[in-house]
């Protein structure tokens, strides 16, 4: 019941994805060959959310791995859990998208998209009751952003009533991997605004900061960053996979977190995070993790929640705890920091409790917040986009693949609209209701 098909597009998506499958397999007691080695029935009870049972009791991830070049696939296959995936579910081209959104979305990616949709269809058909798709990709490259958004829009057509959830790695403010990131990101956001139900925005720089400051790792690798992301992805879906006192699923998350259809870009956080040395000095109680969860240093985006206000938030607790305590803490947070929460949505924190904590922890909490400060990120990318687009720098790479300049202008204005929508709701108060009634008619 309630299965999720996980799609990984591009190098970034596949690296996060393969780390994520290590975490999930570990939680369910599945070893790298797909054999169940666990010790508790709870691990098996709803293992089928992410795994399909093949002949001989072998568990196969419901994963679709896509890339436009074979390199990443080879490294996934060579990784610790490389043999667990179905070989047919690796779909790759030979040419690569070369960090070009147009190649991923219109030329190279479009040639591959039919075979990808076939595999997705097969996976969806083997499900009892498909809950939705989760897509891991980055917005700065070519494949994850271009082909990822193409796939999202195709899946949207075919499964209009299923939840479409994306884990999107957004370019960082200071560190840039690619010069054309602003173009690729803006074009992708333009698609995500229309086609996804919930987008978790994750930012490499914020992840580096968490590794440096909180976990005290001197030289964090992408593996460490991806592990952090996996912890969150696993936390978001743990209610589907393990029994709990207060359950939540992808649809409940969307219903409770998205006040207006376009504002579905969330911030993520995870607690407890502490360095190996300081673990024994920290408390592990509901108030402790609640406090750490709302800490700006724990957010996986380079946007400061203090600069915006929470439209809605969701706290997904894991571990044995009393519901009363959780409710008290949530109320407490809202009362103490009421200025950071929008007052025209009362009780805007949703909480859920799952009984099984992650490996090695007594208690953990995953935080998903819809904060207006995420506009900082879009605004930053928009400024970089405008600076390059005004001079038409690098544009020939995109027009050469058949794109039109109009698309860039549309994407830019769509992103600017998004920023101003966030700003409008950040400034809105209860009193001004009369003014908005006329505007809301569109």
Curated annotation (Swiss-Prot):
BP GO terms, sorted? microtubule-based process
Has keyword Nucleotide-binding?
A: yes
Q: Which SUPFAM superfamilies match?
A: Tubulin C-terminal domain-like, Tubulin nucleotide-binding domain-like
Pfam families with a match to the protein in the record: Tubulin, Tubulin_C
Q: Where is the signal peptide?
A: none
Q: Which GO terms describe its cellular component?
A: cytoplasm; microtubule
Question: What UniProt keywords apply to this chain's record, in alphabetical order?
Answer: Cytoplasm, Cytoskeleton, GTP-binding, Magnesium, Metal-binding, Microtubule, Nucleotide-binding
UniProt: Mg(2+) binding residues: 69
- Localization in the cell: Cytoplasm, Cytoskeleton
Keyword Nucleotide-binding recorded: yes
Q: Which InterPro entries match?
A: Beta-tubulin_BS (IPR013838), Beta_tubulin (IPR002453), Tub_FtsZ_C (IPR008280), Tubulin (IPR000217), Tubulin/FtsZ-like_C (IPR037103), Tubulin/FtsZ_2-layer-sand-dom (IPR018316), Tubulin/FtsZ_GTPase_sf (IPR036525), Tubulin_C (IPR023123)
Q: Which SMART domains match?
A: Tubulin (SM00864), Tubulin_C (SM00865)
Q: Where does GTP bind?
A: 11, 69, 138, 142-144, 204, 226
Q: Which GO terms describe its molecular function?
A: GTP binding; GTPase activity; metal ion binding; structural constituent of cytoskeleton
Which cofactor(s) are needed, names only?
A: Mg(2+)
Q: What is known about what this protein does? A: Tubulin is the major constituent of microtubules, a cylinder consisting of laterally associated linear protofilaments composed of alpha- and beta-tubulin heterodimers. Microtubules grow by the addition of GTP-tubulin dimers to the microtubule end, where a stabilizing cap forms. Below the cap, tubulin dimers are in GDP-bound state, owing to GTPase activity of alpha-tubulin.
Subunit and interaction comment: Dimer of alpha and beta chains. A typical microtubule is a hollow water-filled tube with an outer diameter of 25 nm and an inner diameter of 15 nM. Alpha-beta heterodimers associate head-to-tail to form protofilaments running lengthwise along the microtubule wall with the beta-tubulin subunit facing the microtubule plus end conferring a structural polarity. Microtubules usually have 13 protofilaments but different protofilament numbers can be found in some organisms and specialized cells.
* Family to which this protein belongs: Belongs to the tubulin family.
Q: What protein is this chain from?
A: Tubulin beta chain
Give the source species: Trypanosoma cruzi
The major lineage groups are: Eukaryota, Discoba, Euglenozoa, Kinetoplastea, Metakinetoplastina
């Amino acid at each position: 019941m309630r299965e999720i098909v996980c799609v990984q597009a591009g190098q970034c998506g596949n690296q996060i994805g393969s780390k994520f499958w290590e975490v999930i397999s570990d939680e369910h007691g599945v070893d790298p060959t797909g054999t169940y080695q666990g010790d508790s029935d709870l691990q098996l009870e709803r293992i089928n959310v992410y795994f399909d049972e093949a002949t001989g009791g072998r568990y196969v991830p419901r994963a679709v791995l896509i890339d436009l070049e074979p390199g990443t696939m080879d490294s996934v296959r060579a990784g610790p859990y490389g043999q667990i995936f179905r070989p047919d579910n690796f779909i790759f081209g030979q040419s690569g998208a070369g960090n070009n959104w147009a190649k991923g979305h219109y030329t190279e990616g479009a040639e591959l998209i039919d075979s990808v949709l076939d595999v997705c269809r097969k996976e969806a058909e083997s499900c009892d009751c498909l809950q939705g798709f989760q897509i891991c990709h980055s917005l700065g490259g070519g494949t994850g952003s271009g082909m990822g958004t193409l796939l999202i829009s195709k899946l949207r057509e075919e499964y209009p009533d299923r939840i479409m959830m994306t884990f999107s790695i957004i370019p960082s403010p200071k560190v840039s991997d690619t010069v054309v990131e602003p173009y690729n990101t803006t074009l992708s956001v333009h698609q995500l605004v229309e086609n996804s139900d919930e987008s978790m925005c994750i930012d490499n720089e914020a992840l580096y900061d968490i590794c440096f400051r909180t976990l005290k790792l001197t030289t964090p690798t992408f593996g460490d960053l991806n592990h952090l992301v996996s912890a969150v992805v696993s936390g978001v879906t743990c209610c589907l996979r393990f029994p709990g006192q207060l359950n939540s699923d992808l649809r409940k998350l969307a219903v409770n977190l998205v006040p207006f259809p376009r504002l579905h870009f969330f911030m993520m956080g995870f607690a407890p995070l502490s360095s190996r040395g300081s673990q024994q000095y920290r408390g592990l109680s509901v108030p402790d993790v609640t406090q750490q969860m709302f800490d700006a240093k724990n957010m996986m985006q380079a946007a400061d929640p203090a600069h915006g206000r929470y439209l809605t938030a969701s706290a997904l607790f894991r571990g044995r705890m009393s519901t009363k305590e959780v409710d008290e803490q949530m109320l407490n947070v809202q009362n103490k920091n009421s200025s950071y929460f929008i007052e025209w949505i009362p009780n805007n924190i949703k909480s859920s409790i799952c009984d099984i904590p992650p490996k090695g922890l007594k208690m953990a909490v995953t935080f998903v917040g819809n904060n207006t400060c995420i506009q900082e990120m879009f605004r930053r990318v928009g400024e970089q986009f405008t600076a390059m687009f005004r001079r038409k720098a690098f544009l020939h790479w995109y027009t050469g693949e058949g794109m039109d300049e109009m698309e860039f202008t549309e994407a830019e204005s769509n992103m600017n609209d998004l920023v101003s929508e966030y700003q409008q709701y950040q400034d809105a108060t209860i009193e001004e209701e009369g003014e908005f009634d006329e505007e809301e008619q569109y």
